[in-house]
């Protein structure tokens, strides 16, 4: 089970949202690149980056921030958020992004997926399905699609997509545990490789997800739980942050009993 730390960028800063609500935004670091370095020091094997501004506007607002992350790390970076054209995909892949995540466009313009898979490998183009009670949400989670999550996955599979990043919106950023049954249901019906996202909060959640490997769930994206130091043995993280001179009020710079 591959653990993939998440970095969400809004107005150039590293933030986390609660259930995708832009009004419930918490800033963790002014420079997302510093966050990426911290993840790598914690032995991350891949980083998941989302341009939240682009998710709303469709414009690659935080492109330079993402370029900085790619340039400073030696591991694969996957990027999502408002990527709705071949040109946008090319722009990211040209700077060294390993994998591009297509979200809203998979619903509104499935032909884009077909075009991309004619040009790029399936490992470079993945589809993100962000669902609320089984219904995919698009355009920064502000609109609903007219199909079920597994139906969208089926259409993508026909086009040659091999992996879905599946986010349970009801769990995202809530620190209330992973949506095990929801993820299991989706993975069983999709019959594809699945990266789970949304709600993973404790090691128990990771064990639950690992039990879904037989259904294709082989990785998980974790955001707020890591930022809030919910997992044991994050003492190394704390020590490294002090070396960067990061403000002690930054949540993950607080020692917790689990780290002592």
UniProtKB/Swiss-Prot annotation:
Keyword Isomerase: yes
Pathway stated in the Swiss-Prot or TrEMBL entry: Amino-acid biosynthesis; L-histidine biosynthesis; L-histidine from 5-phospho-alpha-D-ribose 1-diphosphate: step 4/9
Top-level EC class: isomerase
Keyword set, alphabetical order: Amino-acid biosynthesis, Cytoplasm, Histidine biosynthesis, Isomerase
Biological processes annotated in GO: L-histidine biosynthetic process; L-tryptophan biosynthetic process
Domain of life the protein comes from: Bacteria
Primary localisation category: cytoplasm
Family: Belongs to the HisA/HisF family.
Protein name: 1-(5-phosphoribosyl)-5-[(5-phosphoribosylamino)methylideneamino] imidazole-4-carboxamide isomerase
Source lineage: Bacteria, Pseudomonadati, Chlorobiota, Chlorobiia, Chlorobiales
């Amino acid at each position: 089970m591959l653990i993939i730390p998440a970095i969400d960028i809004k107005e150039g800063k590293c933030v986390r949202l609660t259930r995708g609500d832009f009004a419930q935004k918490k800033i963790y670091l002014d420079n997302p690149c510093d966050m990426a370095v911290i993840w790598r020091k914690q032995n991350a094997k891949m980083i998941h980056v989302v341009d939240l501004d682009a998710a709303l506007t469709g414009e690659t607002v935080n492109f330079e921030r993402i370029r900085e992350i790619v340039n400073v790390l030696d591991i694969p970076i996957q990027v999502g958020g408002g990527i709705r054209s071949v040109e946008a995909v090319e722009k990211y892949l040209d700077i060294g992004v390993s994998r591009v995540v297509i979200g809203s466009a998979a619903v509104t313009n499935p032909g884009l997926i077909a075009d991309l898979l004619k040009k790029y490998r399936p490992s470079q183009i993945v589809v993100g399905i962000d669902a609320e009670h089984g219904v995919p949400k698009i355009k920064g989670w502000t609109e609903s699609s007219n199909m079920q999550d597994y139906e969208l996955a089926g259409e993508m599979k026909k086009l040659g997509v091999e992996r879905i990043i599946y986010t349970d919106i009801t769990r995202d950023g809530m620190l209330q545990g992973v949506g095990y049954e929801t993820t299991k249901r989706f993975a069983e019906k999709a019959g594809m490789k699945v990266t789970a996202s949304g709600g993973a909060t404790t090691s128990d959640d990771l064990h639950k997800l690992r039990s879904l490997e037989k259904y294709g769930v082989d990785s998980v994206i974790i955001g707020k739980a890591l930022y809030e130091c919910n997992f044991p043995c994050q003492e190394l993280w704390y020590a490294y942050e002090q070396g960067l001179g990061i403000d002690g009020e930054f949540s993950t710079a607080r020692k917790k009993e689990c780290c002592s």
